[in-house]
Amino acid sequence: MDLGVRVSGHETVSSPGQTELGSGFSNKQERSGFDGEDCWRSSKLSRTSTDGFSSSPASAKTLSFHQGIPLLRSTTINDPRKGQEHMLSFSSASGKSDVSPYLQYCRNSGYGLGGMMNTSNMHGNLLTGVKGPFSLTQWAELEQQALIYKYITANVPVPSSLLLSLKKSFFPYGSLPPNSFGWGSFHLGFSGGNMDPEPGRCRRTDGKKWRCSRDAVPDQKYCERHINRGRHRSRKPVEGQNGHNTNAAAAASAAAASTAAAVSKAAAGTSAVAMRGSDNNNSLAAAVGTQHHTNNQSTDSLANRVQNSRGASVFPATMNLQSKETHPKQSNNPFEFGLISSDSLLNPSHKQASYATSSKGFGSYLDFGNQAKHAGNHNNVDSWPEELKSDWTQLSMSIPMAPSSPVQDKLALSPLRLSREFDPAIHMGLGVNTEFLDPGKKTNNWIPISWGNNNSMGGPLGEVLNSTTNSPKFGSSPTGVLQKSTFGSLSNSSSASSTIIGDNNNKNGDGKDPLGPTTLMNTSATAPSL
């Protein structure tokens, strides 16, 4: 390659293989990383004279890349002014360079002996005057990106190898920061810090150099082994939880069904009394319903003995002795069914049943034969089924006082209620009417039932309970202790109570029961609590 350089005087080339100064620096290149021939070829300075030198004084300015840096080529030049050899120095006095800016950048970038500069595409692009701070890697990436762009514009799928090689070429060692090229962080949307060099591989690591060798689950970061590593170990699978919930629901539904069946059976066995309103008279129906007393467990066996003592049950089959499922709370209403006088409780003679009550129209609740007489009070109770009336046990009950008696209101204060089921104290006044048994056996009907067991009891109460014959009509009871004021009875002595009762019975004139035969209207009668 010829270079036009003006040198004053005659020049003598010390190299025997070179006949001309501008023939090129092809044989003695001693500096690595700088290819002077390529740089001078790219400059293509024109020759202005036939002898290879330019006659223009302006062309005497030497080429300089940096000030004071020689080309390390030994050349002997006879200077008529000095007449000595000197090193050819391409330094410019004016500091102005005639070479293209690319040559200076080529010098600064430090290419090594050709390199990518010798490629046709790169060299062609450089000769067309491409300017900009691009390195070799940037040019390679630019060509690859241009190729990808051609694929995109041609509507052809981009090969994965082209994309992977492009991603791997971005900062493989992390040596160059993104902003060193002047393009900022523009790298096709990829970031060097978050980029995965192996996209399809599990990303589970030990925090240092080890990485899982398994392939990751599609659309996940980790493999099947490590995908659930971050979850709590005690967490059960969803399928197991669903199965457990279904089993629990099935068990709960079965229990609910069995409970409903038991309740329906209990409801079928109990009375079908429909209570209406919240009046005090409706507490009769609540007391007539099943009531449970847990303090005395001997009443169950006692009721069974009452039913099975004669072979034929005193109480009909429609009467449920005690319900095991339902336990309604005991009402504290003083007008309940079962407010009785203690004298009639303790004197079984004169057909005095222990169901003597003090409420005003109580006979209308139990007397189906005299409903016309008490039509005013009957509207508080729902109509009873006719098929149940025939099965109910009829009792001969005597109300010892007239309905208009002034002492009747005092009797309402008695707390003795029919709260215990089939209490023995009631059965000593409980007898079967002559409709069922022979009148000759009527004396045996009033034999009192002993407490819980058949053992005889001592004391005044045992004397009354163990009596086998009818006591005198107005016999006094020695059990004055039961006639205390806490019971709210008519007086503090049983004799006085008997006298008042006898007087009231005489006032009726005919001496008959003012209510007549009444019918027990409950399927589960309750007994007084002592």
Curated annotation (Swiss-Prot):
A single BP term in Gene Ontology: response to nematode
Localization per Swiss-Prot or TrEMBL: Nucleus
One GO MF term: transcription cis-regulatory region binding
Induction data: microRNA 396 (miR396a or miR396b) negatively regulates growth-regulating factors (GRF1-4 and GRF7-9). Up-regulated in response to cyst nematode infection.
Motif Bipartite nuclear localization signal, chain ranges: 201-211, 229-236
Domain (QLQ) ranges: 133-168
Annotated function: Transcription activator that plays a role in the regulation of cell expansion in leaf and cotyledons tissues. Component of a network formed by miR396, the GRFs and their interacting factors (GIFs) acting in the regulation of meristem function, at least partially through the control of cell proliferation. microRNA396-GRF1/GRF3 regulatory module acts as a developmental regulator in the reprogramming of root cells during cyst nematode infection, leading to the formation of the syncytium.
Oligomeric and partner information: Interacts with GIF1 and GIF2.
Other facts: Overexpression mutant display larger leaves and cotyledons, as well as a delayed bolting of the inflorescence stem when compared to wild-type plants.
The name this protein goes by in its record: Growth-regulating factor 1
Phylogenetic classification of the source organism: Eukaryota, Viridiplantae, Streptophyta, Embryophyta, Tracheophyta
